[in-house]
Every structure is written in structure tokens, then in C-alpha cells.
Swiss-Prot record:
Keyword presence, Protein biosynthesis: no
Signal sequence residues: none
The protein's name in its UniProt record: Adenine phosphoribosyltransferase
The protein's assembly and partners: Homodimer.
Keyword Zinc set for record: no
HAMAP family: Aden_phosphoribosyltr
Enzyme class: transferase
GO biological process: adenine salvage; AMP salvage; purine ribonucleoside salvage
Source organism (scientific name): Ureaplasma parvum serovar 3 (strain ATCC 700970)
Keywords annotated in UniProt: Cytoplasm, Glycosyltransferase, Purine salvage, Transferase
Length: 173
């Protein structure tokens, strides 16, 4: 039986990556066991069902790893949010800061219709900067953020305080 403790045991801490002072949570070992991913997606689906969503937004790149199978499981559209200059059509754009730098995210303008309710999926919630920027994209498209879901939440960074909608994480540190 796969439980939270088992999943946590497979996540590696990598000190000083991508820069000094950061402890990176390496989730790649989880993907060596498909049943772990199935358990994570099932948990995310249970949360999503309570939100009455119309679409799922995945954050590049590790958010895609969970958003794609979740969209298939729930039969909901999957909207990709990518780093700058990776989408070929007209985009909404939003700036943000990370735990270890700053960047921008983009979403196709025709991906989300006004008043659609979305669930944002990412692997990790740290400072909340990435997802706050994605929420900005949703507002630009006149959509509604129903919530966001993560494999890992670093609670000590209080990222959820920057976010709207319900927040759920399978693992909390």
C-alpha cells in the first residue's frame, strides 16, 4: 500500500541546488514507480471534484507531470502555462519572483474562456510567486481560480497567503 510516508521517503533533498542556500526537493524518483503517480493523481482528483472545475492549468515544467494525467482522469481540458517565448500564438503574460530568482509565465489567449473555473497544478508550493502569476493570467482571461494543488507545500514559506481559491498539498514540510 502506497501512503504519504512512502511517497516522502522517495523524495530526495538536494542541498544548494539550483543555488547555495536552497534545498531542492527532487521528485524524479517518484516516476520510477507508476503506482506512486497513480496515488498522487487520485488524491488530486478527489480534491478537484469538490471544486466544480472546467479546466486544469499546469505550470511548466513539473506541474505538467501531474496536470496531464489529472486532466485525462477528470476528462477536463489541460491548459499549459509556459516560460516566455515557448507558446506560438497570442499570449497573456505575467511576471513573478521565485524562491531563487525571477521570471515570467505565459498562457495562450484562446485557452481559457471567461468565467471558466480552473484548478492550477504544480509540483511544489514555496513562496507562491509562480502560482500567483498564473492566477494573474487567469484573471487576464476573465477566468476564475477555484483552487490549486501541489505534491509538496513548504509551509514555512507561507506561499498560500498570496493565493486565492482553495489550496491543497499531499505533502507538507
Amino acid at each position: 500500500m502506497i501512503n504519504i510516508d512512502y511517497i516522502k521517503s522517495k523524495i530526495r533533498d538536494v542541498p544548494d541546488f539550483p543555488k547555495k542556500g536552497i534545498v531542492f526537493k527532487d521528485i524524479t524518483p517518484l516516476f520510477l514507480e507508476p503506482k506512486i503517480i497513480e496515488k498522487i493523481v487520485d488524491d488530486f482528483a478527489d480534491f478537484a471534484k469538490s471544486l466544480n472545475i472546467d479546466a486544469i492549468i499546469g505550470a511548466e515544467s513539473r506541474g505538467f507531470l501531474f496536470a496531464a494525467p489529472l486532466s485525462i482522469k477528470l476528462n477536463k481540458p489541460f491548459i499549459l502555462v509556459r516560460k516566455p517565448n515557448k507558446l506560438p500564438n497570442d499570449v497573456y503574460s505575467a511576471e513573478y519572483t521565485l524562491e531563487y530568482g525571477s521570471s515570467r509565465v505565459e498562457m495562450h489567449k484562446d485557452a481559457l474562456k471567461p468565467n471558466q473555473r480552473v484548478l492550477i497544478v504544480d509540483d511544489l508550493l514555496a513562496t507562491g510567486g509562480t502560482v500567483a502569476a498564473i492566477e494573474n493570467l487567469v484573471r487576464q482571461a476573465k477566468g476564475i481560480v477555484a483552487g490549486s494543488v501541489y505534491l509538496i507545500r513548504l509551509g514555512f514559506l507561507k506561499g498560500e497567503e498570496k493565493l486565492s481559491g482553495k489550496v491543497h498539498a499531499l505533502i507538507n514540510y
